[in-house]
């Protein structure tokens, strides 16, 4: 692995998905990532634009598939066989109090959404369709990787935000729009800092084909070795 990290990117074909720079991306993020791409070009990488047309459908599919898996996996969390427990006079109260106390708001939200998506009458309408979208997204990545070795793109359409600045679930979900397709497709990815906006970091993600984790790390490590963003520690609220 260490040998792989030091091989650089000269001659590698790096794809840039045009859909990851669509309307809604912060202009500062766009500039930072474009500068990172130029750094790769200067290091000998071959840069080419690619298309992942189903990117816009990934968010909706993910927030059906992920809550469904959450609901299914956490159904066993009862405080008896799994997890912490709050003892109560009755078994039912033990279940209810344990799950209420130890599940956070977002977990509860996902359990409810997932239970709904998997319920009778809605499985085909939601979960099955979401899995079909997932398959399409995975196939698009497979097709793109026939022409490039790896992808480079923004990690998020916005820079990191201050803790507590956002509490609305929808706006939080939208911050994941550029990493969710990678998760749905089951691909290795790594994020590295590529700039700061008002003291808050901007992320660059590297995406590689399945089982090519070493390649993703190699491309990311090459960028870190050529820049100093990863070594900066800007005080919050102070422009870097």
Each language-model region and where it sits:
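Charged, often glycine-rich, active-site loop that binds/positions anionic groups
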Residues: 59-73
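General small-molecule cofactor/ligand-binding pocket signal
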Residues: 46-51, 190
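Structural helix-boundary/capping segments
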Residues: 1-26, 30-43, 108-139, 184-240
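Short, surface-exposed recognition loops and adjoining beta-strand edges that mediate ligand/DNA contacts
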Residues: 51-59
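Short, hinge-like loop/turn segments at secondary-structure boundaries
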Residues: 64-68, 169-171, 207-209
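Short, solvent-exposed loop/turn segments at secondary-structure boundaries
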Residues: 25-29, 61, 165-167
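Serine-dependent amide/ester hydrolase catalytic core
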Residues: 9, 20-22, 54-55, 76-184, ...
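Short Asp/Glu-rich motifs
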Residues: 58-60, 164, 201
């Amino acid at each position: 692995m260490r040998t792989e990290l030091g091989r650089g990117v000269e001659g590698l074909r790096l794809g840039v998905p045009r859909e990851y720079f669509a309307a809604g991306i912060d202009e500062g993020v766009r500039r930072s990532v474009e500068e990172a791409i130029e750094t790769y070009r200067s290091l000998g990488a071959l840069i080419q634009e690619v298309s992942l047309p189903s990117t816009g459908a990934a968010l909706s599919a993910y927030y059906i598939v992920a809550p469904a898996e959450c609901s299914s996996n956490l159904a066993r969390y009862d405080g008896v066989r799994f997890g912490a427990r709050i003892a109560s006079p009755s078994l039912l109260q033990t279940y209810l109090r344990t799950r209420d106390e130890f599940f956070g708001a977002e977990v509860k939200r996902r359990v409810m959404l997932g239970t709904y998506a998997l319920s009778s009458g809605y499985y085909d309408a939601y979960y099955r369709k979401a899995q079909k979208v997932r398959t399409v997204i995975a196939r698009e990545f497979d097709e793109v990787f026939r022409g490039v070795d790896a992808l480079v793109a923004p990690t998020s359409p916005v820079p990191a935000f201050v803790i507590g600045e956002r509490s609305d679930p929808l706006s939080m979900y939208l911050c994941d729009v550029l990493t969710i397709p990678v998760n749905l497709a089951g691909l290795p990815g790594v994020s590295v800092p590529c700039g700061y906006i008002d003291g808050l970091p901007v992320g660059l993600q590297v995406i590689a084909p399945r089982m090519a984790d070493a390649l993703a790390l190699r491309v990311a490590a090459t960028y870190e070795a050529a820049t100093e963003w990863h070594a900066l520690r800007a005080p919050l609220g102070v422009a870097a």
